């Protein structure tokens, strides 16, 4: 007999640094999920990844207080900032430019994010990444 799902929870946690402090502790604690068990499992699963990389995670918790989690790719904005070598996007995206990014770099990001995006092909994924770049104030070149 399959376990009965009590709900799902979406969090964004930095790779290798899950700990019971907010926002993780309160979010899991109020649902009765074992916080330390999640932190240990998440840190073990992300130990090969770059430390501090934000990882979206979907936690499915069951009525017997057990849980499973699925990790996704980091957000597009993380990849864009890393590729363009900027700390943050522009505060006024239509007017001031924060940096520039090439079509080749956009293609690399789109290929990495393809399974998380709802795009039919790589061109659709590239268009989504390009839109994110423009909304961050990055200039798309080449």
From Swiss-Prot:
A GO molecular-function descriptor: large ribosomal subunit rRNA binding
Post-translational modification: One or more lysine residues are methylated.
rRNA-binding among keywords: yes
GO biological process, one term: translation
One GO cellular component, as annotated: cytosolic large ribosomal subunit
Cysteine pairings via disulfide bonds: none
Span of the signal peptide: none
Superkingdom field: Bacteria
Keywords assigned: Methylation, Ribonucleoprotein, Ribosomal protein, RNA-binding, rRNA-binding
Matching SUPFAM superfamilies: Ribosomal L11/L12e N-terminal domain (SSF54747), Ribosomal protein L11, C-terminal domain (SSF46906)
CDD domains noted in UniProt: Ribosomal_L11 (cd00349)
Subunit structure: Part of the ribosomal stalk of the 50S ribosomal subunit. Interacts with L10 and the large rRNA to form the base of the stalk. L10 forms an elongated spine to which L12 dimers bind in a sequential fashion forming a multimeric L10(L12)X complex.
Function text: Forms part of the ribosomal stalk which helps the ribosome interact with GTP-bound translation factors.
Similarity-based family: Belongs to the universal ribosomal protein uL11 family.
Protein name, as recorded: Large ribosomal subunit protein uL11
Organism name: Rhizobium meliloti (strain 1021)
């Amino acid at each position: 007999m399959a376990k009965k799902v009590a709900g799902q929870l979406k969090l964004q946690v930095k790779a290798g640094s899950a700990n019971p402090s907010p926002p993780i502790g309160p979010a899991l604690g109020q649902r009765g999920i074992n916080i330390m068990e999640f932190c240990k499992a998440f840190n073990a699963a992300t130990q090969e990844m770059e430390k501090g990389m934000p990882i979206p995670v979907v936690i499915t918790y069951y009525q017997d207080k057990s849980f499973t989690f699925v990790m996704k790719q980091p957000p597009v904005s993380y990849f864009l900032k890393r590729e363009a070598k900027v700390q943050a996007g522009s505060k006024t995206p239509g007017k001031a430019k924060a940096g520039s990014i090439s079509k080749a770099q956009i293609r690399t990001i789109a290929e990495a994010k393809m399974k998380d995006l709802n795009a039919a092909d790589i061109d659709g994924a590239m268009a989504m990444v390009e839109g994110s770049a423009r909304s961050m104030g990055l200039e798309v070149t080449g």
